[in-house]
């Protein structure tokens, strides 16, 4: 099975280890992974900031870049959801809307792809840690991926799991929200960190790098001994 990796800006610029873990994991599960070099930002930050015309330039580039892909997989629910939004955003441009729909139909968030396309729940991972899991807003509320991450984490050998209190509360990142509404964002992430501390977990796991950077940054500034890991890194652990 051929998979084209949609790496996302945050992984590309700040968390290349997540990209590496994603590729290694998919290859170990029998996928042939390629990285289309024409990919850029999906356009979400620009679109959410009101720069619709500029964001559509990026969207068209991404549609063309992944046009020949069999499957498109991303280690980010937020960015994968943006691809799913393309058909709606191009609804007044029929030719582009058709191309956008084809892209949307073959795009998956990583855990969703593993569980619902590859039909695998036990990837053979081992991690001797006490962990809790942060549920990201875009991945669950918009993309609709709710069960796949936990189905995979339940099979990680040695992982002691503790539910996160108020797990559906936003961490305060929200892309440009954390910049535009910084004081509110800071309060929200403080509350999220307090919930993480309440679990007494060694590691916080999540599936969106934006959330993990936001929460992890706050954990670091508070000098808390809590490790932050993307779910791709956990599933690739041996």
Swiss-Prot record:
GO biological process entries: lactate metabolic process
GO MF annotation, one: oxidoreductase activity
Any one GO cellular component localisation term in the record: cytosol
Protein name, UniProt field: Lactate utilization protein A
Family of this protein: Belongs to the LutA/YkgE family.
PANTHER family, sorted: LACTATE UTILIZATION PROTEIN A (PTHR30296:SF0), UNCHARACTERIZED PROTEIN YKGE (PTHR30296)
Function field: Is involved in L-lactate degradation and allows cells to grow with lactate as the sole carbon source.
């Amino acid at each position: 099975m051929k998979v084209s990796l949609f790496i996302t800006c945050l992984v590309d610029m700040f968390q290349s280890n997540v990209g590496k873990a994603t590729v290694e994991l998919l290859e170990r599960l029998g996928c042939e992974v390629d990285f289309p070099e024409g990919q850029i930002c999906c356009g979400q930050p620009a679109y959410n900031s009101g720069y619709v015309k500029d964001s559509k330039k990026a969207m068209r580039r991404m549609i063309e870049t992944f046009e020949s892909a069999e499957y498109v997989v991303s280690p980010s629910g937020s960015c994968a959801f943006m691809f799913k939004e393309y058909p709606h955003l191009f609804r007044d441009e029929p030719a582009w809307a058709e191309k956008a729909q084809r892209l949307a139909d073959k795009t998956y968030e990583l855990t969703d792809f593993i569980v619902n396309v590859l039909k695998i729940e036990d990837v053979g991972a081992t991690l001797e840690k006490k962990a809790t899991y942060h549920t990201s807003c875009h991945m669950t509320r918009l993309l609709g991926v709710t069960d796949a991450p936990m189905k995979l984490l339940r099979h990680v050998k040695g992982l002691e799991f503790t539910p996160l209190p108020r797990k559906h509360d936003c961490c305060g990142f929200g892309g440009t929200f954390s910049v535009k509404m910084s004081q509110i964002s800071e309060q929200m992430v403080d509350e999220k960190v307090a919930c993480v501390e309440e679990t007494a977990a060694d590691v916080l796991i999540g599936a969106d790098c934006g959330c993990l950077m936001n929460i992890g940054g706050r954990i670091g500034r508070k000098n808390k001994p809590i490790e932050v890991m993307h779910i791709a890194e956990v599933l690739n652990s041996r």
